[in-house]
Amino acid sequence: MNLTIPFAKGHATENDFIIIPDEDARLDLTPEMVVKLCDRRAGIGADGILRVVKAADVEGSTVDPSLWFMDYRNADGSLAEMCGNGVRLFAHWLYSRSLVDNTSFDIGTRAGVRHVDILQADQHSAQVRVDMGIPDVTGLSTCDINGQVFAGLGVDMGNPHLACVVPGLSASALADMELRAPTFDQEFFPHGVNVEIVTELEDDAVSMRVWERGVGETRSCGTGTVAAACAALADAGLGEGTVKVCVPGGEVEVQIFDDGSTLTGPSAIIALGEVQI
């Protein structure tokens, strides 16, 4: 039997998501439903789904049961621990729909609690800062894309990343690069990995492209921008700093500290509707 549910469509630096409000936790969102909804020809189309639910209703959640929980699913139906762009859009939705009372609040994720600050917001657009936690540098590894080997820094942001700073790579050459699914060290990354190709730090800025596990290339990846900033700073011999990260979908600001990191960037809610699943 077909089920009709409300949805919203939004994006954060063109990393796009379907928001499914499920405050009463009545929807059994299966992987098959996710794949169908995220299909860009037969469905609504998105890089993933953000289900809005209380942490108390999420199996395996380890956060405060009273928190709103970002139940994030990749476009292939798999569960994902964390999504920095998704958190900004999720926070925008909660605040603009009066599901929270303050501009500063916590959100539950499978990677733990993320604190957010709404810097500006209306029903359609917002600027949001997210406390992304301490980047966990896991070591050095490599990947192969189209027969070219890239060396990178393993960074765990609640989800796994391999951020590859490429010496001498220009922003224009990066834009022209043919990016395909990478092969990687499966012992180093047993649960798969998101791969970022990054230019060297110049004038406190880098350019980045990303291949996300379970999705493919996306226009942006929030956790990936933090991993990229961390790798670029390390490549430049720096332990902390503020980095503008330029992605195909726009720009974000990443701050890396000794004891944490933040991600600041835009969010947009572009459509509301109903869909049969």
Swiss-Prot record:
Biochemical pathway: Amino-acid biosynthesis; L-lysine biosynthesis via DAP pathway; DL-2,6-diaminopimelate from LL-2,6-diaminopimelate: step 1/1
Subcellular location: Cytoplasm
Enzyme category, top tier: isomerase
Major subcellular site: cytoplasm
UniProt site (Could be important to modulate the pK values of the two catalytic cysteine residues): H161, E212
Catalysed reactions, semicolon-separated: (2S,6S)-2,6-diaminopimelate = meso-2,6-diaminopimelate
GO molecular function: diaminopimelate epimerase activity
Location of the active site: C83 (proton donor), C221 (proton acceptor)
Disulfide bond residue pairs: none
Keywords, in A-Z order: Amino-acid biosynthesis, Cytoplasm, Isomerase, Lysine biosynthesis
Pfam entry (one): DAP_epimerase
UniProt xrefs under SUPFAM superfamilies: Diaminopimelate epimerase-like (SSF54506)
Protein EC: 5.1.1.7
Sites where the protein binds substrate: N15, N74, G84, N85, N159, N194, E212, R213, G222, T223
GO cellular component annotations of the record: cytosol
A GO BP annotation: lysine biosynthetic process via diaminopimelate
PROSITE patterns given in the database record: DAP_EPIMERASE
Keyword Electron transport: no
Complex formation: Homodimer.
Its biological purpose: Catalyzes the stereoinversion of LL-2,6-diaminopimelate (L,L-DAP) to meso-diaminopimelate (meso-DAP), a precursor of L-lysine and an essential component of the bacterial peptidoglycan.
UniProt similarity note: Belongs to the diaminopimelate epimerase family.
Descriptive protein name: Diaminopimelate epimerase
